[in-house]
């Protein structure tokens, strides 16, 4: 396919136009007085949102050269969202300011490679400064604060704080759409996986259609159970000791299933069988997780165990097991806390090493199930549009809160970036030439968020920036919602350090890329072929 190419100044100008198209659309949403943006949907009602990354993702430009600039800026927003879950608008704004400042300097003859290195040094100093002023988050009240600010709703803040308190910081918190108007929190203690009973005859509560086993023993195997002969020695021990049994196997069918059901109906012993969760290698890992959690062993021929030789001390134990048509929940597994801790650390190490987002998500689910349980926030609203918007806000707030627990918090409203200006100024003073110019680009960008928040609230940004700088108080800032200066930490206007740090690093990374671009190559658009048939008759 033929290509079109633009070089040098012309290429960078096209990128600049693309950057401006995205940034000017996104930055109007920054701060508590930020405006909304309406996104057209081909089907259904338009989406009204003030979430930076949602808006950025929708933007595609007609000009292919300008579109490259737009896509690069979207990368800064998306990457920030993936890592920190928030801060997308800040990242977009910072990147725009750095690109515009950098291009001015390039036009004046600066060397792009030296600018890039100067910017990197300045960002390094700013990140160190952020870590220095960061305050750790450790109590429920401050967690609720962070969540309430991100979601702009105190009730949601409380729900998220409660969820984190119940399942721990490594626990999984999922957000689902509710059938009702209210928003509620449901916490599933222990380990839950998406497999229900194999036969409905196994239920203990016919009204709720669920099976509840108190103090059961748990057989965990990767085998398919079809012959009753394999199970008989174990079942005899179960009856002898009057135990209740949960079987987690690859499958239970035929004569083995019939025997279990008949004995359950006769009241000989209580038993529930479920299929093992997951597939392939992931299934083996999950069975091992369940074994460690319950203090049992995986009965597998790979490990040299035969079902006929299984004794009660090889089975797992739990305080309670609840099985519905779709889920199995194991509460109060009797595993050794040391072994569980080792397994948790092993999964954490795998999360660090993996490069696949899907694998990371699945590993985090496994980690949560071992580390404390699952909390589900059921989101309700009066209309479909409101429901989508509310769910979005809660997901954002959840990610921001997790980031705050991880790396602590800094004063919000863009004040943290103003606070690290002194750290960056020291770097600027120590550099010369184009290195210095590069560091100054970052220095100027650090003022942009406060300026934009003020301007979105209808106030002169420059005056606000100067007043905050003059105060010499690290927590002093402008509350755009109440339109007054205040102590940001006391007022509860805070940002997770991770969000601010990630936004700055990603913005500088994308800006450096654009500034060091010397050519853009895009496809030549295909001319649409005319479908009108030729007039007249063919020659015979």
UniProtKB/Swiss-Prot annotation:
InterPro entries reported in the protein's UniProt record: Chaperonin_Cpn60_CS (IPR018370), Cpn60/GroEL (IPR001844), Cpn60/GroEL/TCP-1 (IPR002423), GroEL-like_apical_dom_sf (IPR027409), GROEL-like_equatorial_sf (IPR027413), TCP-1-like_intermed_sf (IPR027410)
Keyword Nucleotide-binding: yes
Any one GO CC term of the record: cytoplasm
HAMAP family membership: CH60
Locations listed in the record: Cytoplasm
Family: Belongs to the chaperonin (HSP60) family.
GO molecular function: ATP binding; ATP-dependent protein folding chaperone; isomerase activity; unfolded protein binding
Residues the record lists as binding ATP: 29-32, 86-90, 413, 495
GO biological process terms on file: protein refolding
Keyword annotations from UniProtKB, A to Z: ATP-binding, Chaperone, Cytoplasm, Isomerase, Nucleotide-binding
Segments forming a coiled coil: none
Biological function: Together with its co-chaperonin GroES, plays an essential role in assisting protein folding. The GroEL-GroES system forms a nano-cage that allows encapsulation of the non-native substrate proteins and provides a physical environment optimized to promote and accelerate protein folding.
Catalytic reaction list: ATP + H2O + a folded polypeptide = ADP + phosphate + an unfolded polypeptide
Protein name: Chaperonin GroEL
Top-level class of the enzyme under EC nomenclature: isomerase
A matching Pfam family: Cpn60_TCP1
EC number(s) stated in the UniProt entry for this protein: 5.6.1.7
Gene3D superfamilies: GroEL, GroEL-like equatorial domain, TCP-1-like chaperonin intermediate domain
Description of how the protein assembles with itself and partners: Forms a cylinder of 14 subunits composed of two heptameric rings stacked back-to-back. Interacts with the co-chaperonin GroES.
């Amino acid at each position: 396919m033929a290509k079109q190419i633009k070089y040098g100044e012309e290429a960078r100008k096209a990128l600049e136009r693309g950057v401006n198209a995205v940034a000017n659309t996104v930055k109007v949403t920054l701060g508590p007085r930020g405006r909304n943006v309406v996104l057209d949907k081909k089907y259904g009602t338009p989406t009204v949102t003030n979430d930076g990354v949602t808006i950025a993702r929708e933007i595609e430009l007609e000009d292919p050269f300008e579109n490259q600039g737009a896509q690069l800026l979207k990368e800064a927003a998306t990457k920030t969202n993936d890592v920190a879950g928030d801060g997308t608008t800040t990242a977009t704004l910072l990147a725009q300011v750095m690109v515009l400042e950098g291009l001015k300097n390039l036009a004046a003859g600066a060397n792009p490679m030296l600018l890039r290195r100067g910017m990197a040094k300045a960002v390094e100093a700013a990140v160190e400064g952020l870590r220095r002023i960061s305050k750790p988050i450790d109590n429920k009240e401050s967690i609720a604060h962070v969540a309430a600010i991100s979601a702009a709703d105190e009730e949601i803040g409380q729900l998220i704080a409660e969820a984190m308190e119940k399942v721990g910081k490594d626990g999984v918190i999922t957000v689902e759409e509710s059938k009702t108007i209210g928003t509620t929190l449901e916490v599933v203690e222990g380990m839950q996986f998406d497999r229900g009973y194999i036969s409905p005859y196994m239920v203990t509560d016919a009204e709720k259609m669920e099976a509840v086993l108190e103090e059961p023993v748990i057989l965990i195997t990767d085998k398919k159970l079809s012959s009753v002969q394999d199970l008989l020695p174990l079942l005899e021990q179960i009856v002898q000791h009057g135990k209740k049994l949960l079987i987690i196997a690859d499958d239970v069918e035929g004569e083995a299933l019939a025997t279990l059901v008949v004995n359950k109906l006769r009241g000989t012993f209580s038993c529930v069988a479920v299929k093992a969760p997951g597939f392939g290698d992931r299934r083996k890992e999950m069975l091992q997780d369940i074994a460690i959690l319950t203090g049992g062993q995986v009965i597998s021929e790979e490990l040299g165990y035969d079902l006929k030789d299984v004794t009660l001390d090889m089975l797992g134990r739990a305080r309670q097991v609840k099985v519905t048509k779709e889920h199995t929940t194991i509460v109060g597994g009797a595993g050794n806390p040391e072994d569980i801790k080792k397994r948790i650390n092993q999964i954490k190490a795998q999360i660090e090493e993996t490069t696949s987002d899907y694998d990371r998500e699945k590993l985090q689910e496994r980690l949560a199930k071992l580390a404390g349980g699952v909390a589900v926030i059921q989101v309700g609203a009066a209309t479909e549009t409101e429901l989508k918007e509310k769910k979005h806000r809660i997901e954002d707030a959840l990610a921001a809160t997790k980031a705050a627990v991880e790396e602590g918090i800094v004063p919000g409203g863009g004040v943290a970036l103003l606070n690290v200006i002194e750290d960056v100024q020291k770097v600027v003073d120590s550099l010369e030439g184009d290195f210095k110019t590069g560091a100054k680009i970052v220095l100027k960008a650090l003022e942009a968020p406060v300026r934009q928040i003020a301007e979105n609230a209808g106030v002169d940004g420059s005056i606000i920036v100067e007043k905050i700088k003059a105060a010499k108080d690290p927590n002093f800032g402008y509350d755009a919602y109440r339109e007054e200066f205040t102590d940001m930490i006391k007022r509860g206007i805070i940002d997770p350090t991770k969000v601010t740090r990630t936004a700055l690093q990603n913005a500088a990374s994308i800006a450096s890329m654009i500034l060091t671009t010397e050519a853009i190559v895009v496809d030549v658009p295909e001319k649409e072929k005319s479908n009108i048939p030729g007039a007249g008759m063919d020659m015979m």
